[in-house]
Every structure is written in C-alpha cells, then in structure tokens.
Amino acid sequence: MDEKSKVTLHGTWASTYSKRVEIALKLKGILYEYVEEDLKNKTESLIQLNPVHKKIPVLVHDVKPVAESLVILEYIDETWQKSPRLLPEDPYERAQVRFWVSYINQQVFEVMSRVIFQEGEAQAKSVEEARERLKVLEDGLKKHFPNKIIRENDDVGLLEIIIIATFGAHKVYHEAIGVEIVDPANTPTLYNWIERLQELPVMKDVELPRDRLVNLLQSYRQKHLQQAANA
C-alpha cells in the first residue's frame, strides 16, 4: 500500500468512538494501520491531525485527516461504496437511522457515563433516567425497524455499529460497577440486537478485553469518586 492510499486510524483501545470506526473498517474489509494514542499525553501528530478538538478518533486517508466518529463513518461509506452500505438508500429510512444514532449519541451515552462516576442516590437517579431513555430507544427500534434480522455482516449498518459500540460491553459494565442498565426485561429488542451482533465474527475481532476493561472502569470510578469526596 503506497503512502497516498494508506488508511490509518488514530484511537484508543477502550474508546467507544474509536470502536465505531474499527467496526466499519473491518465490515468493509478495508486494510488499515492502527495507532494507539495516549490521551493523557497527546502527541504532536494527533494535535496536528485534529487541531480543533485534539481528540480521537482520526482517520487518515490519502494523507488527509477526517475527525469525529460519525463524520468518519459516513466518509468511509461514501468512499468505499461496497457492501455493507452503512446507510439505506431510501431517504426516509436513512433519516430514521440518523435520528436514532443522534438520540443514542446525545441522550443515552451521556447519562450512561454519569452512572459510572456516581454512587448512592445520585447514581440510582441516573440509572432510572438511563433506563427510561433506553425504553424510548426500544420503542423506536420496534416501530421503525420491526423486521430487522441480524445474521451476517451485510445486515449491519450505521445504527447497528453505534448500538454494538455503545452497549456491546454492557455486561462488563455491570460487573465493574454493579449496575445493570441494559435490562432484557425492559428492552428486549435492544438486548436481542446486541446479542445477535455479538455473534458475528467481525464483532469478536474488535471485542474489548474483559479483565482490562473491568480494571479500567473501576480505576476511573474510584479516582472520580475520590476527587469528588475531596472537593
């Protein structure tokens, strides 16, 4: 692969946002180089590639950087127009996918992050809020994607990528912080999508190492709680 056509992903191993891009690249069968970034000690290279946000992920293609995970995913789909296509051809279906992706990004991810760093009454309140928002997502999946079948890579699109990257490690989160957010009784459709997606070989290739993730979550949680106690 010459330097001009080379594809490089700058990310971090535990990042949901990086994981989204990894999944898309593997689904499309795109060869790429992965660069692990240390966000506590950002490299000059990362800052130059993403001078506005100075964050990962950044995809470099044809020596040109593309930042922000959702922007990168659409760039991948438009540049490599081979199966699976990440967005449907029908404008209304495409709008629905983008709406629910936005909902997860803006309404669900934030409250789930709060749960990790809270305890007691504050955490219980956030857990309830997270479950309520997931129930809205559940109803949306049943209404707009009632016949969804997930058996192979071609059944995976943008929404499925966001779901598995966001919720794929929910059992590990349960183990690490002792709270179950994705409840099969409350959100059976969402739970089923996650289970089916996890069975695909491509998802197993990008699965986060359980022990390492548990240790990271518990470490972050304890550090945050200690800082809050000392504030």
Where are these regions (language model features)?
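Short acidic/histidine-centered micro-motifs embedded in hydrophobic/aromatic stretches
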Residues: 100-103, 115, 164, 209-213
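GST-like domain detector, emphasizing the conserved glutathione-binding G-site
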Residues: 1-152, 222-224, 231
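Acidic-histidine catalytic/liganding microenvironments
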Residues: 200
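GST superfamily/GST-like fold recognition
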Residues: 153-177, 185-192, 197
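Residue-level detector of short coil/turn "hinge" positions at structural boundaries
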Residues: 32, 181, 204-205
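Conserved, non-catalytic sequence blocks in retroelement Pol enzymes and Pol-derived host proteins
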Residues: 63, 182-184
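C-terminal helix/juxtamembrane-tail motif
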Residues: 211-231
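Substrate-binding/catalytic groove segments of enzymes
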Residues: 147, 171-177, 203-206
